[in-house]
Amino acid sequence: MIETFYEVMRRQGISRRSFLKYCSLTATSLGLSPVFVPKIVHAMETKPRTPVLWLHGLECTCCSESFIRSAHPLAKDVVLSMISLDYDDTLMAAAGHQAEAILGEVMTKYKGNYILAVEGNPPLNQDGMSCIIGGKPFIDQLRHVAKDAKAIISWGSCASWGCVQAAKANPTQATPIHKVITDKPIIKVPGCPPIAEVMTGVITYMLTFDRFPELDRQGRPKMFYSQRIHDKCYRRPHFDAGQFVESWDDESARKGYCLYKVGCKGPTTYNACSTTRWNGGTSFPIQSGHGCIGCSEDGFWDKGSFYSRLTNIHQFGIEANADSVGVTAVGVVGAATAAHAAVSAIKRARHKDAAQDTAATQK
């Protein structure tokens, strides 16, 4: 019998107070209101830890590198307490035939009740021989493990979209997971890599409510991918004011102006970078002075230079041409300034008249 998350925490000497605090912080990190805290507490107390099998295909392990750096919940809490991570050839102690034996045992014991997490993708060309796991093509392992999984998580842009190994002309025919496994519910968590707290947040939500979070039409969780980076970017006021960096060493760059003209893809990229940020909420690429490359969007690797600016963006809330933004902004600011001056003048006149009337009455 698998222990519940609460039982594991108590066994580790964690107090009830600390457990409740953890549940409250978890609700906050997921963007949930306080009314959900009792539900999280109940789930952590009663639901057994879910077995998770984590496979690796064609990838660079950046998703795992991001995952283990999660600040809340901590990766150690997720791996050692919240879930039962029974197979991950990068993190597990066993290797070789021992590791593959564990995979088979878990699949048999928890048939239909385990979550399959996939990092990377399978190559289909040459019968999948470009990626071999345990002496067999990864595509065979993927199909075998997916067969009895209750849900599948596609970690990162490799599993979600194909990423750089699927770049033209894609000689290995690297293929995203949803185009290979078509009969299972799949949640995509794109990014190269995804934000650590987004990864642990998705797992926490699934374990707590025993379902996927609400997904957008591309299969991404809306709680993390419903807004463009541009929408909450701290440099957005500079965009609206027509203040842009023209080259990397100009005065505008030193002042922290908008990076749109030097290739920032924030206006077309849906992710939580500008709100959740990276390294425990410390920063994100735009804050560090480099434009967004759109790494969570499908096909970003084949859309030209990262430093070529977007043109003719036709989305709500985005001006079609950055060159006209400054002119428009000047006009708006000028009109607003004139209106403000007129209102101020009227108020001063009224105040002066009122003062004169008061003085006359006192006489």
UniProtKB/Swiss-Prot annotation:
Binding site for [4Fe-4S] cluster 2: H230, C233, C258, C264
Compartments reported by the entry: Cell membrane
GO molecular function terms attached to this record: 3 iron, 4 sulfur cluster binding; 4 iron, 4 sulfur cluster binding; electron transfer activity; ferredoxin hydrogenase activity; hydrogenase (acceptor) activity; metal ion binding
Cofactor(s) needed by this chain: [4Fe-4S] cluster; [3Fe-4S] cluster
Bilayer topology annotation: Peripheral membrane protein
BP-aspect Gene Ontology terms: anaerobic respiration
Reactions catalysed, as given in the entry: H2 + A = AH2
UniProt-listed InterPro entries: Cytochrome-c3_hydrogenase_C, NADH_UbQ_OxRdtase-like_20kDa, NiFe-Hase_small_C_sf, NiFe_Hase_small_N_sf, NiFe_hydrogenase_ssu, TAT_signal, TAT_signal_bac_arc
Quaternary structure and partners: Heterodimer of a large and a small subunit.
Protein name according to UniProt: Uptake hydrogenase small subunit
Broad EC category: oxidoreductase
List of residues binding [4Fe-4S] cluster 1: C60, C63, C158, C192
Gene Ontology CC: [Ni-Fe] hydrogenase complex; ferredoxin hydrogenase complex; plasma membrane
Pfam family, one: Oxidored_q6
UniProt function note: This enzyme recycles the H(2) produced by nitrogenase to increase the production of ATP and to protect nitrogenase against inhibition or damage by O(2) under carbon- or phosphate-limited conditions.
